[in-house]
Design a protein with these regions (language model features):
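A detector for small-residue-rich transmembrane helices and their helix-helix packing motifs
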Residues: 2-208
């Protein structure tokens, strides 16, 4: 298969899976509208480090955002990097997303400063590092292109976010998300077995 053929296949795959990503994004925006209606009080359900109830926020925090700029920027990056991750298949996308959410969320709960941590930035950072690790282990043209484009278009913003001191920005979430994505990429087979086994026990279907 030529490079052009691979690129055409990738583009077709992105278009095919775009409705799935837009559905996730749609529910995230719907939740944000509800959050705005309640004066952003839903953010209290984010990850609150070292509070037992804050553990629930691990699965809720990625869908909560502190303002419209926050959710708008994350929506853009989610579609960009998520499109490359989902090229591996919806099951891989779901496994990677869950692994990043759980690993980054637990690390944030254990080690982050005491505050309500919300936003999809940790997941997006995880997608970026996952793609880079995958490109290292499986250097085909699509994975290399995904990592390169992620680095070029998103790298400056995300690298800056790692050391950001902006109020309301969860620096720890960015760092732990990046680490979670790298770990998921490096140990994907083992992590996939763990995630799929857990999903099976809960009766969840993550795609074939």
């Amino acid at each position: 298969m030529t490079i052009i053929d691979q690129l055409n296949t990738a583009l077709s795959g992105i278009v095919l899976h775009l409705p799935y990503l837009l559905t996730i994004l749609g529910w995230t925006w719907a939740l944000h509208v509800v959050n705005v209606f309640f004066g952003y009080r839903l953010c209290m359900f984010g990850i609150i480090p070292r509070f037992p109830t804050g553990l629930v926020g691990i699965f809720i925090a990625p869908f909560l955002h502190g303002n419209f700029n926050h959710i708008f920027m994350n929506s853009f990056f989610f579609l960009g990097l998520g499109s490359f991750v989902i090229l591996q298949g919806e099951q891989v996308f779901n496994v990677v997303s869950i692994a990043i959410i759980v690993i980054a969320g637990l690390l944030t709960w254990l080690f982050a400063r005491r505050a309500a941590h919300v936003g999809a930035s940790s997941v997006i950072m995880g997608y970026w590092s996952f793609l880079m690790v995958r490109a290292y282990y499986h250097p085909d043209i699509i994975d290399l292109l995904a990592a390169a484009l992620g680095l070029y278009y998103f790298g400056v913003h995300m690298a800056a976010s790692l050391v950001s001191h902006e109020k309301g920005v969860s620096v720890e979430g960015h760092v732990f998300g990046f680490l979670a994505g790298a770990v998921t990429g490096a140990f994907y087979p083992a992590i996939a077995m763990w995630v799929l086994a857990g999903a099976d026990k809960l009766g969840l279907y993550l795609g074939g």
